[in-house]
Amino acid sequence: QQDLSEIMDDCHIAEEKDKEGKIKGRFEVKVSLKGTQPEVITQKRILDKKEEVKDTLASLYNKYKAGFDLQFKLPNSYSSYDSQDDFIDYYPFVPYQFKLIMQVFNSFLNLGYVAKEVKGNERSIIKVIHSTAKANADAELGKFISFDELYNNMFEEGLQARGQKAVDNALRMARTYQTDKPEKTRLAIRVVNVLFMICNISQTDQLLFPATVDNVTSLLVNNMDTPRLTIKNEVEKVVEFLCDNNIIRREQGKQGAPDTFTFYSEEEMKVAQLIQSQVVDNNTQAEQLKDIFNKYITALR
C-alpha cells in the first residue's frame, strides 16, 4: 500500500490518485512501515527468538550488562540495551544501529550514492539486516554485530558510480595499511567503511552523531572481551594514517569538543597532495627567513 503511494508521488500523476484511493479502500487497515516500524518488523521476521534460547540470552545479558555502556559508548540519542528484554529482542544487533543505518540510507539517497529504488528505505534496511544476520548465522554466542558489518555486499552492490567513486580512494589506501599484518589491514578497511557512512549523514545528524574517534570505536565493537581502549588506540593509528595520506582531514573540536573527521573531496585531495609534495630546501628557507628578518628590522627603524 505504501509503495503504491510513493510510486504515484514519484510519477507526479495527479489523475491516478483517485484510482489509488479505490485500491486502498479494499484494505481495512493501512499498515505503515515508517518511523520505528523497521525495528518491529525485523524483530518479528528475522530476530524473533525461540523460547528455548531466551534463557541462554538472559544469562548472556546478565554476564555482560555492566559493560554495555562502556563498550557501546554512544551519543545521548542513540542507545545500546535498556533491559534484558531489549537485549533478547535485538541481539546480535544493537538498538542504535537501526536508527543510524536509516540516517545513512536517507543521506546516501539525497547524495545520489544509491539508486532511487532505495526510496522507502525501510524495506532496504530490513534486507540489509537480514543479509547481515544470515552472514553471521554460524557465529559463536557472545558475538555482536558491529555497525561496519551492515556495509556488506548487498549495501556495496547498491552504490551508484558516484557513491563508489567517493569511497574508492579511501579503500585503496586502507588496503596498503600494514600489509604484513592482515588483521590490521582489515581493521583499516572497517574504519573506512564506518567513516564513509557517518561522514556522509546529514549535517543535522552529524551534530547528534559526529565522526569522532570515540564514535568510530563504538561502531566497531563486536565483542565484550576486547578492551575498548585497545580498539580505540588502533582506530587512532588508522585515522592518523588516513590523514597523513590525504584521505580524511581532522577538524578541531570547538570549546573542548573532540576532533571530528571528514573525507576530502577529489579536488581537495589533489590540492593536499600537491602541497605535501612541495619540498623546500634549506637554502630557500634561509633566504625566506632573511627577507622576513630584514623587513622586520627595517620596520623598526
Residue spans for each PLM region:
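Amphipathic alpha-helical segments of the small helical/lid subdomains adjacent to P-loop NTPase cores
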Residues: 3-125
